[in-house]
Amino acid sequence: MFSWSADTVRFMADACRRTDFHEKLTALLLPYLKPTDHICDAGCGLGYLSLALSSHAAHITAAECDAAALSVLRQELDARGIANVTPLCTDILAYTPAEKFDAMVFCFFGSMEEILAAALRQCRGTVLAVVRDDVCHRFSGAPRAPGRHSFDAACGVLDAHGIPYTAQRAALDFPQPFRTLEDARTFLTIYGG
């Protein structure tokens, strides 16, 4: 599980504010979602995907276990006047909602096995897993086994379980701006592996 710190929150917020990544990702997800859906953005981090999805769904529950990360989302919701997103501080892998979600989005969150277990318990409809393909991934907050978190590995898990799915590859840019040279050093220390 990703560990948030003051530095990682700041780096992610700076990057999210300077890219259209979440809007482009939302455009890729929309064909699988309905405007009437109550969507769970599972492991939402700072919630920028929830913000992008908010104008396309009835309600978004933005679930994240780190209160500091969710505070960024709360600030953005207030600043933008968005009322249909509910931040929820919880471990989504252990959470059981009162009513199952219409759809769940897992964006760079959890193993495929964790996603399947959570979705089975929490979702009655569409499950979307946005998987980073480690073949192209250069930085990581923790060591990863080569290929373990790849597009092909995710498809392999679904195939092994006999779960029907639609797969789509996409390449979206997510640049990281730095305020100072020291920021760049800190970033590379954290994510350089």
Named regions from a protein language model:
Residues G43-G47:
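Class I SAM-dependent methyltransferase "Motif I" SAM/SAH-binding loop
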Residues R124-H137:
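Conserved beta-strand signature within the Rossmann-like core of class I S-adenosyl-L-methionine
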Residues G81-I92:
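Conserved SAM-binding strand-loop segment of SAM-dependent methyltransferases
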Residues G110-Q122:
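A short, conserved alpha-helix within the catalytic core of class I
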Residues T19-T36:
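Conserved alpha-helix/loop element of class I SAM-dependent methyltransferases that forms part
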Residues S150-F187:
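Substrate-binding/catalytic lobe of Class I Rossmann-like enzymes that use SAM or dcSAM, i.e.
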Residues Y48, S55-I82:
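Class I SAM-dependent methyltransferase SAM/SAH-binding core
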Residues A6-D20:
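Class I SAM-dependent methyltransferase Rossmann-like catalytic core
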